[in-house]
């Protein structure tokens, strides 16, 4: 009977081992790689890279930056003659000498866009001021002053070519020449 017990024990153990899949054998070969997983979140930002090499030099051009043209002049103490360029009595700035000081005529030496401005203070007179460009009026302003001093201003931007001329003409009318006073400032500069 003891043999039967041993035999039954062996059979029961064998069944238990077989139900669990049998005995563990040696490991098999590695399997094939699986599909890629889900993309993870981005990592932290890295440090900046080194500077790149210098680029190739650009084309050379002549810069007109050094070319300038500007003036400011003043007339005071006398009344200007009509239909003639105003002869200014004081030069406040004319470093490039583009305004001919004895005639009051500006001659363009550097082509480009110019701002021209004039301011007139008047008393006891009527004044008409014209900004002239090569004998054509491009801006005209009028003002009348009886007892109170008045002022008159004008500004215009003109594109000019080399050799073109610009000046002011002023016509002054008054019944009291001894009391009439006119002061004119005229400026121009290349933009």
Swiss-Prot record:
Superkingdom of origin: Eukaryota
Assigned GO CC terms: collagen trimer; extracellular region
Tell me the keywords, alphabetical order: Collagen, Secreted, Signal
Which portions of the sequence form the region Disordered?
22-61
Q: Which SMART domains match?
A: C1Q (SM00110)
List the InterPro entries. C1q_dom, Collagen/C1q_domain, Tumour_necrosis_fac-like_dom
The protein's matches in SUPFAM superfamilies, at most eight in alphabetical order, are given as: TNF-like (SSF49842)
Q: Does the keyword Hydrolase apply?
A: no
Where does it primarily localize?
secreted
In this chain the Collagen-like domain maps to: 22-58
- Localisation per UniProt entry: Secreted
Gene3D superfamilies assigned: 2.60.120.40
* Cleavable signal peptide: 1-16
Which segments constitute the C1q domain?
64-191
Q: Where is the composition biased (Pro residues)?
A: 26-39
Identify the PANTHER family for this entry. Answer: EMILIN ELASTIN MICROFIBRIL INTERFACE-LOCATED PROTEIN ELASTIN MICROFIBRIL INTERFACER (PTHR15427), PROTEIN HP-20 HOMOLOG (PTHR15427:SF32)
| The protein, known as | Protein HP-20 homolog
């Amino acid at each position: 009977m003891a043999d039967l017990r041993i035999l039954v024990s062996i059979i029961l153990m064998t069944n238990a081992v077989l139900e669990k899949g049998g005995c563990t054998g040696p490991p098999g070969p590695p399997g094939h790689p699986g599909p890629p997983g889900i993309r993870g979140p981005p990592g932290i930002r890295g440090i900046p890279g080194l500077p790149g090499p210098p680029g190739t030099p650009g084309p050379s051009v002549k810069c007109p930056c050094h070319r300038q043209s500007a003036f400011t002049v003043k007339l005071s103490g006398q009344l200007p003659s009509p239909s003639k360029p105003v002869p200014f009595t004081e030069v406040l700035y004319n470093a490039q000498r583009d305004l001919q000081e004895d005639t009051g005529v500006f001659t363009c030496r550097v082509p480009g866009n110019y701002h021209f401005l004039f301011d007139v203070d008047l008393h006891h007179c009527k004044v008409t001021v014209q900004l002239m460009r090569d004998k054509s009026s491009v801006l005209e302003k009028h003002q009348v002053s009886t007892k109170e001093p008045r002022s008159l201003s004008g500004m215009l931007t003109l594109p000019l070519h080399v050799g073109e001329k610009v000046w002011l003409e002023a016509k002054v009318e008054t019944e009291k020449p001894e009391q009439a006073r006119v002061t004119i400032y005229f400026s121009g500069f290349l933009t």
